Amino acid sequence: MTTQLTHLQQLEAESIHIIREVVAEFDNPVMLYSIGKDSAVMLHLARKAFYPAPPPFPLLHVDTTWKFREMIQFRGRMAKESGMELLVHVNEDGVKRGVSPFTHGSALYTDVMKTEGLKQALDHYKFDAAFGGARRDEEKSRAKERIFSFRSANHRWDPKNQRPELWSLYNTRIKPGESIRVFPLSNWTELDIWQYIHLEQIPIVPLYYAAVRPVVERDGMLIMVDDDRLELKPGEKVEQKSVRFRTLGCYPLTGAVESEADTLPEIIQEMLLTRTSERQGRLIDHDQAGSMEKKKQEGYF
């Protein structure tokens, strides 16, 4: 009797195949761990792919020093639970220069603390493949990127120089210094992610659940006051509102949404009714025209 895989089981099988393919083909892979819901699913799939052994590669977190405190606490917990080595890299040059989202703007801050920080870490550890949790439904530049995304020796992505991926066959050939970014969740949607988290009971950062939190309305977004580095502008005031986050990044650049959804079924129901993108609250996606594609061409995730 033939067993028909469900939609989520098909996605799971494809992702596990991709993860195992990378381990078989590359010498020194790493998993980029941004601590968000997509990273949580990707880590869960990696652990499934090699169970009962831990995944044979480390986790890498590029720490901008501006992540939510709850994210950092969760990062340590999951690294310990998975039994994987956690590498944390900070662009110390950017820290010395005092680069922050407030003083330098989101575009320069992202380039220095995220993109340059990532390239520094990949060069330092000589990783030849890096897993990322990006999905094609998130944003238009990600929609046209391959699952195995070739990067030059300078970590640059050329959207006009991508390799065909027919019949789940992937071209992994690279020259010294070149690398591949691999996206096992490419064909998943936001709904798939939430349903899989619910089905598999995957731990996620509590910020995804609605709770009363201190926020400031700024530029049409609700910014959570996560520490005393957030300076109020004239006329701004801190309010207590029931909010949650659909996407997580650096707290000064990530907008919350007003919500009462504090369980996974409620989050899924809310997501089904919304008419805005999950990345609507990510300021870095809108700081210049074609913003995400330009960042990716410069070496961003």
UniProtKB/Swiss-Prot annotation:
NCBIfam families: CysD (TIGR02039), PRK05253.1 (NF003587), PRK12563.1 (NF009214). Belongs to the PAPS reductase family. CysD subfamily. CDD domains: Sulfate_adenylyltransferase_2. Pathway: Sulfur metabolism; hydrogen sulfide biosynthesis; sulfite from sulfate: step 1/3. It is an enzyme of class 2 (transferase). PANTHER family: SULFATE ADENYLYLTRANSFERASE SUBUNIT 2. With CysN forms the ATP sulfurylase (ATPS) that catalyzes the adenylation of sulfate producing adenosine 5'-phosphosulfate (APS) and diphosphate, the first enzymatic step in sulfur assimilation pathway. APS synthesis involves the formation of a high-energy phosphoric-sulfuric acid anhydride bond driven by GTP hydrolysis by CysN coupled to ATP hydrolysis by CysD. Pfam families: PAPS_reduct. This is Sulfate adenylyltransferase subunit 2. GO terms for biological process: hydrogen sulfide biosynthetic process; sulfate assimilation. Keywords: ATP-binding, Nucleotide-binding, Nucleotidyltransferase, Transferase. Its EC number is 2.7.7.4. One of its GO terms (molecular function) is ATP binding. It comes from the Bacteria. Heterodimer composed of CysD, the smaller subunit, and CysN. It comes from Citrifermentans bemidjiense (strain ATCC BAA-1014 / DSM 16622 / JCM 12645 / Bem) (Geobacter bemidjiensis). It catalyses: sulfate + ATP + H(+) = adenosine 5'-phosphosulfate + diphosphate.
